[in-house]
Every structure is written in C-alpha cells, then in structure tokens.
C-alpha cells in the first residue's frame, strides 16, 4: 500500500513485521535454527552451524535487496535467491561452513516457517490490541450502564436500551476474539520442515529428530507431519483476523450512524486536523469509522483468496501457496489498523446524553407501545392488548399527539391503570428488561466469575 495511506489503514508495528527487511530477517532466523538443529543431532558439524549463526548476525545488512527483488521474479519465490546470497555471506566467513547452509530443506520450508514467525509476532500485537479494546469497552460499559438511549432495529427506533448494554455487547465480542486467538495458537504456530515432497528424504533416518530440534530452536510447535499442501493453519489464522475485523466493523457502523447530524448521540474524539471537510467547515466526519469500515470491506475479499488457496495440487502447489504472500500480510495490517482506530474511539468517545433523551422522545411515546401492550396483556390477553395499543398508536400518529395522552383516554386502559401507573409504564428506564443483569454477567466474565 502507498505510504500516504498507511497511517489511515495500518498499524506501524504490524506493518514493520511484514516489511521486506523483516521477512528476510525471519528467513535468516529459520536458516540459523535449521543449522543449529542439525548440528545438535550430528547431521552437520557444530563448527559449521556456529559460523552460520555468526554470519547471520550481520547478514541482513549485507543482503542486496534490489538484486533479491529482481532474482525473485525469475526464481518464482524469494527463498532461492535469498539462500544464494546467504550462502555467499557465510562463504566469506568460512567456505566449508557455507556448504551446510539450507541443508536438506526446500524453499517452502523456510518461507512457511518465516511466515509463521511473522504470524506469531503479529498475532501477539493483535492480541494485545484486542485485550486493550476489551478492557476499555468493559470500563465504558460500567460508566454508561444506566445511560438510556434508543435501541434500533432495521435502522428504526425500536425499544430503549442503555449505552452500557451496547458497549457490554462489544466487550463480549472482544472476549470471544481473545478466546479464538488463544484457541488457535498451539494448532497454527508450528514449524515447517519437510524437504522437497514432505518426506525429508534428504536427511535419511534423521528427519524426525531434526524437525523436533528445529521447532524447539524456534520456540514453535512440532507437527506430526509436514503441511506444505494443507493450508488450513494459514486459513485459520486469517479467519480469526477476519472475524475480529468484522466485529470492529460492526462497531464502527454503529458509532458512525450515531454520529449522524440527526442522531448526534456519540462522537469520535476530536483532534487537530481530524474529521474536517475541504469545503464544509462545519463537518465532523467519522474518520476512524471510515478506516475501520474500509478494512471490514477489504478483508472479506482477501479472505476469498485465502480460502481458495486451500485447493492445492499434490504435495506442493503452483500458485495457490503464492497467493498467500499477497493476502495474509494485508489482512494482518488491516486488522491491526482497524483495532488501533477502534481503541482510540473507545477511549475518547464523546457522549451526548441530552440528544439521547431527545431521540427517545421524538416518537411521542410510540417506542413504549410494547411496554403498554405487555402491561395490558395479563388483564385482557396479548392479542386483545395488541389491538388496543395498535389502534391508539394510529390515532396518536394521525392526531400528532403523545401516545400516553391517547392511551390514557381508552376505556380498557383506564379500567386497569391510573395516571401515575401509566407514567411509570411510559418511563423508558422502566422497560429495560434484564440489561443490567447482562452487563453484570459480562463484567463478571472478565473477572473469571462467569455465571
């Protein structure tokens, strides 16, 4: 992506993890781990592994990235020209040790392992971001647990809720995101080492012990078998990121709608140069929401490519594996960027309680129609109560009067409720159901005390 847009859509640390320089550094790390693992079990001399490790410490500064980029276009992947350059760097230190660089491995072993190392570090950042969003949403849910506002369905006013309930639901989504991240780690953060067709025939009868030592060197999990052609691990990582981005996309949709001029209930935090218009000085645009929604729009398209990459030929694929190199880094960067902007809004959101109250009142009591119906239902049955309230609603709309004024004159209603009882029925805060219980449950879950 253009650097001009990076600050709008990405997060700096995750973008750095997926930079060219970082990728090559992870590949160097994989090659060093391979050499040390093989030396540990006697496949190559320890002296060679020591030289390779020593040379690797300065290798990143000696790699010719321009030449690497040109050669990658000819070779079909970065590993082939990378290994040539790394071998030359080691050769400058010790010609004999250079013979053991990339011993027994194939290009995909190094690239897949480097990819997993990238995922491990990027996932740690994403997890921390989600944790911060979770904690902030919990805090705000507690702060606004009694702030009554309109609940909306099909973009229409429905029944009263509280802002704290909305935020508790968001917090609960973040909790599930954290659970998903934790659930996949052992399954997906694993090393790849299989040689040309996954058999490690190049290492003869020492393949299994080398794989074990290799994974331990990298602090990655060891798999029962190679996974060159079975890409479900990559897909699972991307899928969790896709869910996270979708979750924050839903939140951004909500707060952007609440920022509409006619609603004006919640606003993104202000900052110099933020949210303005080039032609309309009065505008306060939901810039963070635009960024998050763009990510939530883009990630599903990238996920389509990731899912299609599962259908691979035989032991190692042509093209499908390569498509991951384009999609996965972008998914990570967009997810991290969306989380960063969501956290900013959660921390600095501005709430207009007066507008929330005015929006509740703008229907002149119609939003309390269900409350009236349910209060009448025990006396006359739900269906009859529905008919009575429905007729009153139509009259209130036609005469442009408050529903309470109309319903209070209905004989069937006067029979059961006096004016003070009707006043209580029409209070939005009296018709919030079990919202407070739900908020408590979300807060307790965060303490490990889920009911």
From Swiss-Prot:
A GO MF label: lyase activity
Pathway noted in the entry: Aromatic compound metabolism; beta-ketoadipate pathway; 5-oxo-4,5-dihydro-2-furylacetate from 3-carboxy-cis,cis-muconate: step 1/2
One Gene Ontology term from the biological process aspect of the record: beta-ketoadipate pathway
Domain of life: Bacteria
Catalytic activity: 2-(carboxymethyl)-5-oxo-2,5-dihydro-2-furoate = 3-carboxy-cis,cis-muconate + H(+)
Keywords carried by this UniProt record: Aromatic hydrocarbons catabolism, Isomerase
CDD domains the UniProt entry points to: pCLME
Main EC class the enzyme belongs to: isomerase
EC number of this enzyme: 5.5.1.2
Gene3D superfamilies for this protein: Fumarase/aspartase (C-terminal domain) (1.10.40.30), Fumarase/aspartase (Central domain) (1.20.200.10), Fumarase/aspartase (N-terminal domain) (1.10.275.10)
Matching InterPro entries: AdenyloSucc_lyase_C (IPR019468), Fumarase/histidase_N (IPR024083), Fumarate_lyase_CS (IPR020557), Fumarate_lyase_fam (IPR000362), Fumarate_lyase_N (IPR022761), L-Aspartase-like (IPR008948), Protocat_PcaB-like (IPR012789)
Family under the similarity heading: Belongs to the class-II fumarase/aspartase family.
Oligomeric and partner information: Homotetramer.
Protein role: Catalyzes an anti cycloisomerization.
Protein name: 3-carboxy-cis,cis-muconate cycloisomerase
Gene name tied to this protein: pcaB
